[in-house]
Each structure stands twice: as structure tokens, then as C-alpha cells.
Curated annotation (Swiss-Prot):
It is an enzyme of class 4 (lyase). CDD domains: Terpene_cyclase_plant_C1. It comes from Cannabis sativa (Hemp). Pathway: Secondary metabolite biosynthesis; terpenoid biosynthesis. Expressed in glandular trichomes two to four weeks after flowering onset. GO terms for biological process: diterpenoid biosynthetic process. This is Beta-caryophyllene synthase TPS9FN. The lineage of its organism: Eukaryota, Viridiplantae, Streptophyta, Embryophyta, Tracheophyta. Mg(2+) 3 binds at residues 454, 458, 462. (2E,6E)-farnesyl diphosphate binds at residues 273, 310, 314, 451, 454. Mg(2+) 1 binds at residues 310, 314. Keywords: Lyase, Magnesium, Metal-binding. The gene is TPS9FN.
Length: 556
């Protein structure tokens, strides 16, 4: 931490401006992603081969699978985990509906743990009503999971994955998670060379439900290739599709990197975090499909501006400067730029307003109304940043409940979900934006998850400088508990938020599906970047490895 002391003169009076700045780690990527090109001929060839393989899968894999439930489960699970589900949404829906209609009311006493757990997980992932009581057949007379299950590693792993689809109050799934976690940890400790050891290790680190789809696919493709019974067509398609999408994503990142260099915030606002690559990774974790390219580009630019704004309010601007900036943001008028001081705030303000104007042009007249909702969400976010700056300026210590009224906005996830929707074109309607503007419950659950995971791992670093209290400090004071007790309670609330998000998928859902998908995937990104530390501010090994896996290394 450092304090910048600047001199300013007004009416021949000299005053000192003290800025509680901090030093952030510079970008570790340099200009690596600035330029990228692929020959049109090579891209077209790969695209043609992908299309050919998709038809083979439809003709030879899905059309042959309905008579054997175990086979259906395996194909659907493999297709999803290989990152191919967006190509076969109709086929997957039809297959799962067939499984649901033909098995949900049957007696499953003779089923093995693996198939029961896989069916449960796949159906719940897609919103089908399926009771967790089906796992009672795997318990003994004392109500404990049977000891004989301990040696069934595929079954244990499948039950472990299924347990992450639980709702609040489903004790049997909580027990299943504890049971499987204990014995799977013991397995990887004792059986390091077992064929399933690496797959179990990855699952314990991050279950399917909390994994970024592309990152999970990257790992699973390698695992799938090593399976004796793998489908060669699916494997070839998965590899080609991953590499083809990576080309598109690299091209997008190159475009975004050039924009980032052009606005030159790295030099004009040197106090802010330089994380454009990590921010693109963030959005790549939310949606990866080719048709959502515009949504990724728009959303990455906006989250980059929000990150810079966070650093302006958090670690640079004086209260007076921030007050004027916030007033200007609310007015949203380029004529306000000239009154902003210092010059870097003018620069930020102009870039912010110009970006939203460009978004309107890119979307076209019929879609431009969506930008209004994104702009209002950004205003609200920066207003929350200012409320936290006011707490610091006034030395005010909010209660935990009072804190949440502001910090569930300042976490930024409502703004980002609204912004992500504006580039999704036909997927969303004006009613969806109106519904989101009313702060529905699923957004509160998503924001709780985001805010608490962030604060648990970052509050100590933030408190090293002048900083408003986090939810951790507010919880400690309101309830008179230790830091560890506060963090433990916030973690419990994160777990409950995951369970509420799971339940929101239950059909029929009153939540628009694009919103459900965004909530789930934004939550997954939090688990990647904030589970074991602030992997965004302090670029950790996992963040770096994820960038390499998704944006640098191709699959041979």
C-alpha cells in the first residue's frame, strides 16, 4: 500500500490531496493476445468437418440409443461433458424426456449407484422434477450409506456429482456429499495410480455443477480419450470443435486487446488493475457459443470499465472527486466531462459514455432499447460504489443488514447479467429486462454468492489501506463473532445460494432461461476465481492455467 500526495492550488491556497492507492500486480500477458490470425481456408475446412461429424452423431449415436437407459445416460453425459451440448440441444432434451417418462415411476431397487446418480444429476440439471429419496435404497437399516459402496469408485464419484444439485432441506444429499467426499479423498490418497484417480481429484477440486463448461470440456476430452470404450466420432468432434471455438475466442480477445490498448487506461489510469485477458476469461466462462460473440465483446468491455471504476472509487478518487463523478454519471451527458478533475476521470467518463453509444449502433434500431437497461444498471452500480466511498469518508460502520443493501449491488453481478443480455438478441425480451430490474430472488442469491465469496478472500488485503468495512467486518460487529466464525457463516450462505440457484431450474420456472443460464455460469466463474483466493486481483496459478488451457494450448 502507498499514499500519493499531490499538490493543488486554488485561490493561491495550496492543499494536499492524499490518495490511498495500492500497487496491483501488472498484467502477466503483455501484448501476447494483441494479434491473432487464422487462414480462412483452414477455418472453413475445420468448420466443414465439424458439421459433417455433427450429422454422423445425430444419425448414428442419438438415433440408436433409446432402448438402453444406461447407454442414453452415458451418451448424454459424455456429449455434455465434452462441451458439445450446444450442438445437440434438441436431441438431449428428447433423450432426457424419454428417460424421465419411462423411468421416473419405476422401481429402481436393482439399479446400481452410478446409473441412479447420473440419471438424477442429468434430469435435475435440465429442470425435471426428480426426488432425492431415490437414494434411500443405498442406505442401511441405521440410516447410513452402506459400507459396500466405499469400493464402488465410479458410483461414489457419480453420487458426489449428483449431491451438488441439492435443494435446501435435502438432508440425504448433504449426507451423500459428506460420505462421498470423505471416501473419495481417501481413495486418491491411497490409489494415486488408479485410472480414475485424476478424474476424482479434479472433481474434488471442482464438481461438474461448479465448473466452467469449456474448462471442464478441456479436461474431460483428455480423460475421455483414455477410456477404452470411447466413441471415436464424438472424440474427433470434441477436439475439432474445441480448437475451432478457440480460434474464434482468440480472434475476439485480439479485438478486445486492441481496444484496451487504444483507450490506453494502463498509462492514463495506472492505479487501476490491468486485467483485460482475465476479464475475457470471465465472460468466456459465462457463454462460449459462436453466435454470442457480440455479447462476449460488449460484456468484456463493460466489465473492464466496471473494474476500472471500482479502482477509482476504491483506491484513487477523493470524496469530492467521486461525488462530482457520480453526479455526472447520473446525468450521462458528455458535456459534464469538462468539470471532472483530475484529467484521468475525464478520460474514463468519455470512454464510458462513448462505449454505450457504440453499443446502440452495433445493436441496431430495433435492439438499441436494451442499452437503456444496461446503462441504468451501470449507474446503479457506480452509485453503490459511491455509497461505500461515503461510508469511508464519514467513518461510518454499517450493520450487516445495511451493508447488504449496498454491497449486493456493488458486487456488480446484476449489472453484468443485464449487460450480457443485451448482446443475446432474439433470446431475450423487454419483459425480461423489466423483470430483472425488480431484483428477483434468483439475482439476490447470485449476488450473495458473488459478494460473500469475494469478501471472504479479499477483505484482509483491502483493510491494509483506508477502506470501508466488508461484509465480514460488518457481520463480526453486528453478531459479536470472530473473523473465522463470520467467514464460516458467510460460506454457509454461499452453499444455500447454490441450492436456491439449483431449485430455480425446476420446471416450470418463472425465470427466463437465458437469465438462469447466466446466473449459473457467473456463479461458476466466482468458484474458479475466488474459491481459494482473489484470483482476479492477484493472478493465481489457477487463473493463469485456465487462460492457457482455453486460449493458448490447442488439443492435439
Amino acid at each position: 500500500m502507498s499514499y500519493q500526495v499531490l499538490a493543488s492550488s486554488q485561490n493561491d491556497k495550496v492543499s494536499k490531496i492524499v490518495r490511498p492507492t495500492t500497487t496491483y500486480q501488472p498484467s502477466i500477458w503483455g501484448e501476447r493476445f494483441l494479434q491473432y490470425s487464422i487462414s480462412d481456408q483452414d477455418f472453413s475446412y475445420k468448420k466443414q468437418r465439424v458439421d459433417e461429424l455433427k450429422e454422423v452423431v445425430r444419425r448414428e449415436v442419438f438415433l440408436e440409443c433409446y432402448d438402453n437407459v444406461s447407454y442414453v445416460l452415458k451418451i448424454v453425459d459424455d456429449v455434455q461433458r465434452l462441451g458439445l451440448s450446444y450442438h445437440f440441444e434438441n436431441e438431449i432434451e428428447k433423450a432426457l424426456q424419454h428417460i424421465y417418462d419411462n423411468t421416473i415411476h419405476q422401481n429402481h431397487k436393482d439399479e446400481d449407484l452410478h446409473d441412479t446418480s447420473t440419471r438424477f444429476r442429468l434430469l435435475r440439471q435440465h429442470g425435471f422434477m426428480v426426488s432425492s429419496n431415490i437414494f434411500k435404497i443405498f442406505k442401511d437399516e441405521q440410516g447410513n450409506f452402506k459400507e459396500c459402496l466405499i469400493t464402488d469408485i465410479p458410483g461414489l464419484l457419480s453420487l458426489y456429482e449428483a449431491s451438488h444439485l441439492s435443494y435446501i432441506g435435502e438432508n440425504i444429499l448433504d449426507e451423500a456429499l459428506a460420505f462421498t467426499t470423505t471416501h473419495l479423498h481417501q481413495f486418491v490418497k491411497n490409489e494415486k495410480t488408479h485410472p480414475l484417480s485424476n478424474e476424482v481429484l479434479l472433481a474434488l477440486q471442482r464438481p461438474i455443477r461448479k465448473s466452467l463448461e469449456r474448462l471442464h470440456a478441456r479436461h474431460y476430452i483428455s480423460s475421455y480419450e483414455n477410456k477404452i470404450c470411447h466413441n471415436k466420432t464424438l472424440l474427433e468432434l470434441a477436439k475439432l470443435d474445441f480448437n475451432l471455438l478457440q480460434c474464434l475466442h482468440r480472434k475476439e480477445l485480439s479485438q478486445i486487446s486492441r481496444w484496451w490498448k487504444e483507450i490506453d487506461f494502463v498509462h492514463k489510469l495506472p492505479f487501476a488493475r490491468d486485467r483485460i485477458v482475465e476479464l475475457y476469461l470471465w465472460l468466456l466462462g459465462v457463454f462460449h457459443e459462436p453466435e454470442l460473440s457480440l455479447a462476449r465483446i460488449i460484456s468484456t468491455k463493460v466489465i473492464a470499465l466496471a473494474s476500472v471504476a471500482d479502482d477509482i472509487y476504491d483506491a484513487y478518487g477523493t470524496f469530492e472527486e467521486l461525488e462530482l463523478l457520480t453526479e455526472s454519471i447520473n446525468r450521462w451527458d458528455l458535456n459534464c466531462a469538462d468539470q471532472l478533475r483530475p484529467e484521468c476521470l475525464q478520460t474514463f467518463y468519455k470512454v464510458l459514455l462513448n462505449c454505450y453509444e457504440e453499443f446502440e449502433s452495433e445493436l441496431g434500431k430495433e435492439e438499441s432499447y436494451k442499452v437503456y437497461y444496461a446503462r441504468e444498471a451501470m449507474k446503479r452500480l457506480l452509485g453503490a460504489y459511491f455509497s461505500e466511498a461515503r461510508w469511508l469518508h464519514e467513518g461510518y460502520f454499517p450493520s450487516f443488514d445495511e451493508h447488504l443493501k449496498v454491497s449486493l449491488i456493488s458486487c456488480g453481478y446484476t449489472m453484468m447479467i443485464v449487460t450480457s443480455l443485451i448482446g443475446m438478441k432474439d433470446c431475450v425480451t423487454k419483459q425480461d429486462f423489466e423483470w430483472l430490474s425488480k431484483d428477483p430472488k434468483i439475482m439476490r442469491d447470485c449476488n450473495i454468492l458473488c459478494r460473500f465469496m469475494d469478501d471472504i478472500v479479499s477483505h484482509k488485503f483491502e483493510q491494509q489501506r483506508d477502506h470501508s468495512p466488508s461484509t465480514v467486518e460488518s457481520y463480526m460487529r453486528q453478531y459479536g463473532v470472530s473473523e473465522q466464525e463470520a467467514c464460516d457463516e458467510l460460506r454457509k450462505q454461499v452453499i444455500n445460494s447454490w441450492k436456491e440457484i439449483n431449485k430455480a431450474f425446476l420446471r416450470p420456472s418463472n425465470v427466463p432461461y437465458p437469465v438462469l443460464s447466466l446466473v449459473l455460469n457467473f456463479s461458476r466463474v466466482m468458484d474458479l476465481l475466488y474459491k481459494d483466493g482473489d484470483g482476479y486481483t492477484h493472478i493465481g496459478k489457477e487463473t493463469k492455467n485456465s487462460v492457457v488451457a482455453l486460449l493458448i494450448d490447442q488439443i492435439p
